[in-house]
Amino acid sequence: MANNRTLARRRRAFSPLTVVMLAVTLVAFMGVPLSSTGAADAADPVESVEANRRGYTSYGEPPVAVGTSEEYVNSSELAGSRDKGNAEAEEEAAEVETDVQPSSVTIDTEERAAPSQVQVQQERMEEADDAPKPVPVRSAVPSTVAKRQQARHRVIGTAVIAAVVAALLWKFSRRRSGAPREGGENENGGEEK
């Protein structure tokens, strides 16, 4: 009967523990390349959104519009369309001015000349938003010290994982092969002869 149990154990190639160990090893080794790509050093998405809103790329350079050139901007077609738009805007402004009656407007000339504090603050905020601001730029290429540290961590992590896997596989292979266990007991629970 004991002989049948031993044969049944030997036939079973993968025990649940072996499958779990292989899965953990696979995940650990897949994690090493992912962590070595420097994913943690990638630019913060919030920073890139702020930089784009200010008109700068994540590298601190102003964005380059694709397909535009000075020739196109200065072309007669574009200038002509601008003139048409300005002429229409001036006509509308003239119509609006004629619609307003002087008796309905009762603003002192002093109030009209001095801008309010709110207007001054709004103008300052607009000027501050329009001014190009230096964007903190993270280096796209990691320094040699960072590369060495990544390589060292990768080697240490791989060595630790390999040592743990080797120790577990050695322990379970000895147990499966019928080698005597510690304490001199065999698989049947009796003393070895």
UniProtKB/Swiss-Prot annotation:
One of its GO terms (cellular component) is membrane. Glycans are attached at N4, N74. The keyword Transcription does not apply. It is a multi-pass membrane protein. Its main location: membrane. Residues 75-140, 174-193 are annotated as: Disordered. Keywords: Glycoprotein, Membrane, Transmembrane, Transmembrane helix. Belongs to the Gra6 family. This is Dense granule protein 2. It comes from Neospora caninum. The gene is DG2.
